[in-house]
Structures are given as C-alpha cells and as structure tokens.
Amino acid sequence: MLVRGYVVSRKLFASILIGALLGIGAPPSAHAGADDVVDSSKSFVMENFSSYHGTKPGYVDSIQKGIQKPKSGTQGNYDDDWKGFYSTDNKYDAAGYSVDNENPLSGKAGGVVKVTYPGLTKVLALKVDNAETIKKELGLSLTEPLMEQVGTEEFIKRFGDGASRVVLSLPFAEGSSSVEYINNWEQAKALSVELEINFETRGKRGQDAMYEYMAQACAGNRVRRSVGSSLSCINLDWDVIRDKTKTKIESLKEHGPIKNKMSESPNKTVSEEKAKQYLEEFHQTALEHPELSELKTVTGTNPVFAGANYAAWAVNVAQVIDSETADNLEKTTAALSILPGIGSVMGIADGAVHHNTEEIVAQSIALSSLMVAQAIPLVGELVDIGFAAYNFVESIINLFQVVHNSYNRPAYSPGHKTQPFLHDGYAVSWNTVEDSIIRTGFQGESGHDIKITAENTPLPIAGVLLPTIPGKLDVNKSKTHISVNGRKIRMRCRAIDGDVTFCRPKSPVYVGNGVHANLHVAFHRSSSEKIHSNEISSDSIGVLGYQKTVDHTKVNSKLSLFFEIKS
C-alpha cells in the first residue's frame, strides 16, 4: 500500500489492526471474525517499542524535533483509511525511502531515524490489507477511517492488552522478512526521535552513501543468479567508478583513432539507419583503446555486447533525451528499458566478468556515455560532447545503483496458481483465480496480484494499462505498486484517456535470471452500484515490457491478462 506524505518514503502497506484476539472486556461478537484478519502469532506487546523511518532531503533536522501530522499532502497515504505515520523494523529498508522521488537524479538523499514509544505498545499484525474487511471483521465503524479508529480509547481498550497504544503491522512486501508499521498520527506524537544516519551531509553524493548503507542489509545473502555462479550483494564503490569513468572518457576523447572517428560524425540530424551505422563503427574503433580492454574481451564472448546493440540503444536513448516532453526519470529509464538485456550491455548482469566488476562497469559506462553524446546531435540538437557524456555518467550511475540493488535481493518462488501467459520472453499470470475477478455492487477497495518473470535475459517492466470507469471503478494510486524480490517500488499513475489509467514504476524494474516481480493493482469503488461488463472499455489489464519496432513504429511489448466483472 502506498505511503508517503511528509517524510515517509517507500510505501508501506498500511494495515494491522487487531491482535488481541482474547478481547479483554469486549463482547464475544467484537472478535467474531478476528481470526480472518489478525495474525495472533505475530502480534505482541513490547515496552519502549522502536522502529525506523526513512526521511527525504530537507526534513532530517525538522523530524528530530518530533513527529507532526502534515497539514497537507497525502498525510502518509492516498487512502483515508490508511493515513498515518509509517515505519519499518529494518533500518536498511527505511533508507530506501530517503530519496526524493520527484527528483531522483539530484543525487541527494535524506536519512534514517529511529523512533521509540514510551511505555507499553501493542503491535497488531494483520493478515490482510483491505480496510473494509478489517473494519467489518473487527466490528468497527464502516464509515470512519480505519487509522482514526485505531487511535481511539475504545479500540486500545479492546485490542491493546493493557498497552497505551496500538500499532498496526503488515509484511513490508511480498517475499520480504521485514514488516512495516502504521501509526495513528496522534499517537505518533509520543514517539521520541533519534538520528540513525544522515545522508544529507554528502550533498549530491547522498544517494551513493545511501546505497552503500543499504548494501549491508544483504551482505550475508547468497543469491543464485545463474548456473554455476552465485553472488552476495556487491557493494560497488560508486565514487571510484565515477572517477574512473570520467578519466576514461577524457582518455578516449583524445585518442587519435577515436578523435578522427568523432570528426567524421555527420553532426546533424540523419536517418536512424545512418546514425546506427556510424555509431557501430565508433563502437568498433573505441574498443581498440587500452582503457576498454576488459570490455572488448567480454564483447567477443557475449553477442549482447555487440556494436549493433550498443548503437541501437544509444540512438533510442538520444531520442528520448532530445524529447521536450520527457522528464528526468523518463530520460534515465530509457537508458535501461529501451533494449532487452541492456543490463548485460552495460556489464552488470550475469555473463559479465565478475572478477573485476568495478573495472567492467566503469568501462561500460564510459563507452555508453560517449556513444550517447555522439548520438544526440544525430537525432536532435548539437551539444557539447564532453558535457553530455559527463551528464549521462551521473544519470546512468544513479540508475545502476537502483537496478543493482534490485538484482541482489533474495529471490522467491513466483508461485503461479493460474496458467502463465508467455509472450516476447515474459511469463505473466494472475496469482490466483480470485485475483482475476473484479467484484462490484459494493463500495470500497479490492486488490489484484499479477506475477511477472522472464524466461532468460533480464527484461524491463515499463508499466501497466488499467481500464477504469470514472466515478465507479478508479485506480487507487497509493496502493498500486510493484514488488521486486521483496522490495516495493512506487508507481506513478495518470489517466491517458477517460477510461484508461497508465501506471509506471518510479524506479527501473527488471525481471529474469531469478528476479521476479509481483504487480499489485488496487481499484476503488466510490459507489455500491453494480457494474456490467459492457460498461468497461476493455476486459483485460495490459502489462507493458520493452520497446520493439513493428511496421517501422516503436511499440512496447504488451501482455494482456483478461479479467471478469462479477456482482
């Protein structure tokens, strides 16, 4: 479930209410359905209960003065039932929320704080995150927001087991051992705040520090990535890679054969075919430079590193960068999403030389940055080659940090319960038959899970197309998210037609080679009016993958999962 509001950053599923199945002083009917929504084995009472919260840039100092409910914004969640202060039991997961999602390429990050309640706190672990179901089974008001009721004296008396407050908990994300906590805003004011780590002091290198910190969370994990090889989380020194990359770019630019090749550039808009031809020749010339010797070795053994792939990728990235409508995130995402297997092209994924990963990464980024800088004038305006290359280095390093972190999360079994749909290298399916049914005739929420993986090469997930009926069946933007090997990633949703909403991940998402994704789609019904099949524009949800060319037109690979409308 999506969180966010003021300093929260990662989305934390919100819900956990109920634990005290014993119902001290409460009538039997109050807990009649508690077993269906409360996990008593994971509920507990603790003195001086602590958890961790990730805060965005600009809020590290203010949050240490105390927790306050923001006067505007989402106040922790888009859904009124789940507005609250979010935290987690894992400080490394909390760190992942310290990046400003609206400006992810700034390089900045906030920090992590440890928050602690005085006295006794009851943690109620929930089995489900559907607020309507929880309120119904717990005998709560169906019209009052869930988290507001959690903070009432009546609720605390019924479910607190003598504690001063009740905090709800849910799994942090599918496949994760971490949990998230949802705190009532008024109760959260009692939290004492202690700084755990501050990334703001690193300025534009704050995200580097954040990823270095997060790498500690998986230092002991051995993740099976391909036959015959396994890796723990690789803690690459991105400062060193950045410096190495820029040094290599300077050396490459001044090398005679490369300099001559650069002078042969058309330096004006040309056809896509001619641009690719020139870039492929540039790639071949550059690989003869000693600074790219490791990369040349890899290129000779893995066809995905071939010059034609680099050239096609560079042209596509340049086209996106040249677009006046593409925002920063779209521009950088293009670097990894345009070409299938681009992770391998850049020297990160399986198949690359692992004994010298740092050097391979630096060489890959140096060559890629130069090629993109060369490609931009071929598809759009003239730019300074050095400036464009260095700018792209920063973008690609930030993006790789995100992707690399996702790759190195522990894998989990996708657990398909329906027949997967195979297309363009992807495998997509509903998690259960029930997920494929959209029920109407009631007011409230529903969640639907989709499993996504790839057969071999890592492939990108560009987004999802969701049919809607404005005012009757809308997308709950705060709860729609995608989880990659246990790590939740927010999605940015917008209406592209009156009856279609497009949601795309706010960070690059890849599946394949042991990496699986769970797409959680949430719908909201503001009316109890029944919906008929002929009212909705489409009877399928479209999962979008990599770009390909069909009849000279670029389109995304699309996998359609059909659903039923039932009342």
UniProtKB/Swiss-Prot annotation:
Single GO MF descriptor: identical protein binding
Top EC category: transferase
Annotated catalysed reactions: diphthamide-[translation elongation factor 2] + NAD(+) = N-(ADP-D-ribosyl)diphthamide-[translation elongation factor 2] + nicotinamide + H(+)
KW rRNA-binding (keyword) present: no
Positions bearing the site annotation: Modification inactivates enzyme: 185
Domain of life: Viruses
UniProt keyword annotations, A-Z: Cleavage on pair of basic residues, Disulfide bond, Glycosyltransferase, NAD, Nucleotidyltransferase, Signal, Toxin, Transferase
Site feature (Cleavage) residues: 225-226
Record: active site: 180
Disulfide bonds: 218-233, 493-503
Name assigned to this protein: Diphtheria toxin
